[in-house]
Design a protein with these regions (language model features):
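Cell-envelope/extracellular polymer assembly enzymes that use nucleotide-activated donors
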Residues: 2-6, 170
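Short, well-formed alpha-helical segments that are part of the catalytic scaffolds
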Residues: 7-28, 42-46
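Short, solvent-exposed loop/turn segments at secondary-structure junctions
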Residues: 10-12, 42-43, 60, 84-86, ...
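C-terminal catalytic/acceptor-binding lobe
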Residues: 12-19, 163-165, 169-241
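Short, hydrophobic beta-strand segments that form beta-sheet elements in well-ordered domains
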Residues: 32-40, 121
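Active-site-proximal specificity loops/subdomain of glycosyltransferases
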Residues: 37-81, 86-101
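A structural signal for short, well-ordered beta-strand segments and their strand-loop junctions
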Residues: 78-81, 119-124, 182-186, 224-227
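Conserved catalytic core of nucleotide-sugar-dependent glycosyltransferases
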Residues: 88-169
C-alpha cells in the first residue's frame, strides 16, 4: 500500500524544513509522498521553498485534520506528522535511539493494521525510556498522540474530532468506539518541542480547560480530568482492554 505524509502547519516554513522534512528525508521517505496543509493562500506562499505539494486547507487543527481526511480518497493510508518532528526514536536495550528507516516503519505499521483489522496506529506519548516497553504493541484504549500517527482513511463523520484542543484524545476515543481497538507502539516515541511558538494551536491554557470539560461531558465513562502543578488541565483515558 502506498502511503502519503500529511503535515498540518502554520507559520513554520523554516521549522518544517529543518525538522520534519529533514527527518523524513533522512528516513528514506520520498518528497513526492509529502503534502503540507496550510490555512490560506498567504501561508501557501511562504511554504513554497519547501518544494513539497502545498494544499490550502482551513484554520484550526481539528478542522484541518477533518479537511485532510476529506482531501484524500477512501482507503488511502495516511501518515500524519506535526511540522516540528526532530526524530522518531525506538527503545533498544533500555535506551532511545534514532529510528533510521521511516519508510519501513510506516509500511510495516500499515501491514499490522490490516492484520489486526484496525484502522489507526500511534506511538508512546512521552519520550521517556523508563516507562516505555521494548517491542510492545497494544490494542486497548490508550492515547494516540497527534504528533505522529497513521490511519486508513474512511472519511466518516463519526470519526471527526470536534474539540479544538485535545483533538487527538477525542480521535483516539472515536476510533476505539468504532473499531474496538487502536494500535499503539509503546517502544516508539517522537523527539519534538511541545507547545512551541507558532503552529495551529494557541492560548493552550484556556483551550485545554475547555477541551477537557467537553471531553468529560461527552465521554464520561472513559475520561477523567486532572490538573498539573501549573494549573493546566489534562485528560486521562480509562484503559479498556
Amino acid at each position: 500500500m502506498d502511503y502519503v505524509i500529511a503535515i498540518p502547519s502554520y507559520n513554520r516554513p523554516t521549522e518544517i524544513l529543518k525538522k520534519t522534512l529533514k527527518t523524513l528525508n533522512d528516513g528514506g521517505v520520498e518528497k513526492e509522498r509529502i503534502f503540507i496543509f496550510v490555512a490560506d493562500e498567504e501561508q501557501a506562499e511562504i511554504y513554497k521553498p519547501t518544494m513539497c505539494k502545498i494544499v490550502v486547507g482551513v484554520i484550526g487543527i481539528a478542522n484541518q485534520r477533518v479537511f485532510i481526511s476529506n482531501y484524500f480518497p477512501i482507503g488511502q493510508y495516511i501518515v500524519s506528522l506535526d511540522d516540528d518532528v526532530e526524530e522518531l526514536q525506538t527503545l533498544q536495550d533500555g535506551k532511545l535511539v534514532k529510528l533510521t528507516d521511516l519508510h519501513d516503519f510506516f509500511t510495516t505499521s500499515y501491514e499490522i493494521l490490516v492484520r489486526e483489522n484496525l484502522f489507526i496506529w500511534g506511538i508512546y506519548p512521552v519520550r521517556n525510556a523508563f516507562f516505555m516497553k521494548s517491542g510492545v504493541m497494544t490494542k486497548s484504549l490508550k492515547f494516540l498522540l497527534g504528533v505522529c500517527y497513521g490511519y486508513i482513511n474512511r472519511n466518516l463523520k463519526e470519526l471527526y474530532p470536534t474539540a479544538e484542543g485535545k483533538e487527538d484524545i477525542e480521535q483516539t476515543i472515536l476510533y476505539y468506539k468504532m473499531d474496538g481497538g487502536v494500535i499503539r507502539f509503546n517502544h516508539i516515541a517522537v523527539k519534538t518541542k511541545f507547545n512551541a511558538v507558532g503552529g495551529l494551536g494557541k492560548d493552550r491554557f484556556e483551550m485545554n480547560e475547555k477541551a477537557s470539560k467537553l471531553l468529560k461531558e461527552k465521554y464520561p465513562s472513559v475520561v477523567s480530568i486532572f490538573h498539573r502543578k501549573n494549573g493546566m488541565s489534562e485528560v486521562r483515558l480509562k484503559c479498556i482492554k
